[in-house]
Design a protein with these regions (language model features):
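Conserved helicase RecA-like core
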Residues: 2-372
Length: 372
């Protein structure tokens, strides 16, 4: 099947071809036709499967067909982090380049002046994080009366305890008659129950079993004393010289500490987490994507904007508290049919978390005892 078979219009097809995409992914095959008919969608597919295009392409096509153009926001895409908002905005920029559809992105952590100026000029699609969106709404800069399409991206994070209050404040501001699209890499039962109350007879799309891991990723657990994790990391990085490596840390403090430890060992790295300025985070991401640095230390929330198709190695320096997060983390490697490796460092107190991960994914992980 090709994108042309999905009844996508010529201007968007041209942009897709320029991106080098020949065939749609499974989530795109199922979601794009349904979205083009205006149906609500509840879509669950792993990281790196093309979810962004699955909602962006039909929304652009819907808006391009409008006869009456004005400055109002017609599509709202809500996402949990600044990095992910920027990533989605870049995709829309690519797919909409040969259309009249205008889009913009807003997020916190930067001066609002440029964002307000952009809103005054008018945008058809607005990509936003919840905090800045509500802030600018309260100031009277944003009105959602004409929103026809509402997207909640990475729904399991957006509807988590940290965002639920923002979502509840936002929903009454949206028109009752609209298309609602929920997309996420994981869809726990608690989220499904909540989305069922917000979606109208949605088309439910699940491309892989929830919280599964792809077969292209070789997964290994290293049982190691907590104090020896740094030595193990340095050893592995020396053995994988030349490869880009994404290392996950549970906390911001530990991410910075790992950078210092690696620096003393002569290994250059950068950390990306919520305490870093927006400019610092963007700079670090760019350095990692272009290969200026080969090792990136990231916390889970900050890593949402890291989108590299050929990342060979992911290391879990700390195990995540939530097993679904493990799936998200290692989903950064083994993309688009490429082989990937995921290594996890597990101390004595973290061993129960390994059992939770194996129970969730249905896979036994290879185990290695590490001792200096």
């Amino acid at each position: 099947m090709t994108f042309k078979d999905l009844n996508i219009t010529e201007p968007i097809l041209k942009a897709i071809e320029e991106k080098g995409y020949a065939n749609p992914t499974p989530i795109q095959v199922k979601a794009i036709p349904a979205a083009l008919t205006g149906k609500d969608i509840l879509g669950c597919a792993q990281t790196g499967t093309g979810k962004t295009a699955a909602f962006a392409i039909p929304i652009i096509q819907h808006l391009q067909a409008l006869k009456n153009w004005d400055k109002s926001i017609k599509a709202l895409i809500l996402t949990p982090t600044r990095e992910l908002a920027l990533q989605i905005s870049e995709c829309i920029d690519d797919y909409a380049k040969y259309t009249q559809v205008r889009h913009g992105v807003i997020f916190g952590g930067v001066n609002q002046r440029a964002q307000v100026n952009m809103l005054h000029k008018g945008v058809d699609i607005l990509v936003a994080t919840p905090g800045r969106l509500l802030d600018l709404m309260n100031q009277g800069y944003i009105h959602l009366d004409n929103v026809r399409h509402f997207v909640l991206y990475e729904a399991y994070r957006m509807l988590d305890i940290g965002f639920i209050h923002d979502i509840k404040r936002l929903l009454p501001k949206l028109p009752k008659e609209k298309q609602t699209l929920f997309f996420s890499a994981t869809m726990p039962d608690t989220i499904i129950a909540l989305t069922n109350s917000l979606l109208k007879q949605p088309v439910k799309i699940t491309i892989t079993p929830k919280s599964s891991t792809v077969d292209t990723i070789e997964q290994t657990i290293y049982f190691v004393e907590k104090k020896e994790k740094s030595k193990l990391l340095i050893s592995i990085l020396h053995k994988t010289e030349g490869q880009s490596v994404l290392v996950f840390s549970r906390t911001k403090h530990n991410a910075d500490r790992i950078v210092r430890v690696l620096s003393k060992a002569g290994i250059g790295s950068q950390a990306i987490h919520g305490n870093k300025s927006q400019n610092a985070r963007q700079s670090a991401l760019e350095n990692f994507k272009t290969g200026k640095i080969r090792v990136m230390i990231a916390t889970d929330i900050a890593a949402r904007g890291i989108d590299i198709n050929e990342l060979p190695l992911v290391i879990n320096y700390d195990l995540p508290d939530v097993p679904e997060t493990y799936v998200h983390r290692i989903g950064r490697t083994g993309r688009a049919g490429n082989l990937g490796t995921a290594l996890t460092f597990c101390s004595q107190e973290e061993r129960k978390l390994v059992n939770d991960i194996q129970k969730l994914t249905g896979k036994k992980l290879s185990k290695v005892e590490f001792a200096i």
